[in-house]
Amino acid sequence: MNAPERYERFVVPEGTKKVSYDRDTKIINAASFTVEREDHTIGNIVRMQLHRDENVLFAGYQLPHPLKYKIIVRIHTTSQSSPMQAYNQAINDLDKELDYLKNQFEAEVAKFSNQF
């Protein structure tokens, strides 16, 4: 079969960056971020977080091919922000949100564990 090895879905090859940045030369304040070894799960979460930013005019992602494990996130921002700032802010906000969820979950588990 022509399918790649399973480990290739999540192991970033040596010498390959996890995230690469490509500025769009045709549109001002637009760029693409290629994220290696990720899929729709991360792409959709990052896209939705970018949509919360009022300085983001467009945010979308695509999975170029089902057997190539990378996503391309495209961002177009207003002149008040840059795509790099918007991307970094989205990642930081998601990190805080997931940390909060983790802490809340652990607190509830601890409450439940103490009951028994």
Curated annotation (Swiss-Prot):
Keyword annotations from UniProtKB, A to Z: DNA-directed RNA polymerase, Nucleus, Transcription
GO MF annotation, one: DNA binding
Subcellular location: Nucleus
Gene3D superfamilies in alphabetical order: RNA polymerase, RBP11-like subunit
Record field: transmembrane: none
Signal peptide extent: none
CDD domains, A to Z: RNAP_II_RPB11
Coiled-coil residue spans: none
One cellular component (GO) term of this entry: RNA polymerase V complex
UniProt main location, coarse: nucleus
Subunit relationships: Component of the RNA polymerase II, IV and V complexes. Interacts with NRPD1, NRPB3 and NRPE3B.
Protein role: DNA-dependent RNA polymerase catalyzes the transcription of DNA into RNA using the four ribonucleoside triphosphates as substrates. Component of RNA polymerase II which synthesizes mRNA precursors and many functional non-coding RNAs. Pol II is the central component of the basal RNA polymerase II transcription machinery. It is composed of mobile elements that move relative to each other. NRPB11 is part of the core element with the central large cleft.
Family statement: Belongs to the archaeal Rpo11/eukaryotic RPB11/RPC19 RNA polymerase subunit family.
HAMAP family: RNApol_arch_Rpo11 (MF_00261)
Name assigned to this protein: DNA-directed RNA polymerases II, IV and V subunit 11
Native source species: Arabidopsis thaliana
Gene this chain is encoded by: NRPB11
